[in-house]
Amino acid sequence: GGVDIHCHIAGPKVNTARKMRPEEKRHEAVVPRTDRTHSGTLGSVPSTFATGYKYIGMGYTTAFDAAVPPLSARHAHEELEDTPCIDKGFYVLVGNNHYVMKSIADEEPERLSAFLAWLMGAAKGYAPKLVNPGGVEVWKHNQAGNVGSVDDPVDHYGVTPRQIISNVARAANEMGLPHPVHIHANNLGLPGNWE
């Protein structure tokens, strides 16, 4: 069957979306309960049961949620456990993690590798995920802020997105993960972001 290597079916962003659209649960189509299935709701953010049934109905057998914060890993596992029919996992967000950036700034690759190995084991994640590496940290201190390129230094750490990407990729490759690092580069979706 098919493998969806990038979806959003568990974790805080999904639950926030469900809370933002409560009217959908009253008006959207439902998945009826049968002798073999649980009921579920559809809409823009389906219930866990409906998600599993729809994926298997489209021919998918595996799905990976692409963005779970480490502190939300346990709840994401509970949601995925509630999603039937398919194999599933998730990627752990690390691209703006303070400990990651501090380890890189202090030029301690062994400390970074040990931390990532511990974090992946503690969260039981499938791969580390980088989203706008360093850019989110800049935004935290200046709501209109971001990094303009992969070579702009990140406030308070003095590391660049390029250093975050290369160091996390190196550490993940050393771990021998089946999917070493999943990257959403800086300025994704903006013209000229390939530069």
What are these regions (language model features)?
Residues 8-10, 68, 93-97, 131-135, ...:
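Active-site beta-loop-alpha junctions enriched in small/polar residues
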Residues 69-115:
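Mid-domain alpha/beta scaffold segments of enzyme catalytic cores
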Residues 57, 82-85, 122-125:
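Alpha-helix termination/capping residues and helix-transition junctions
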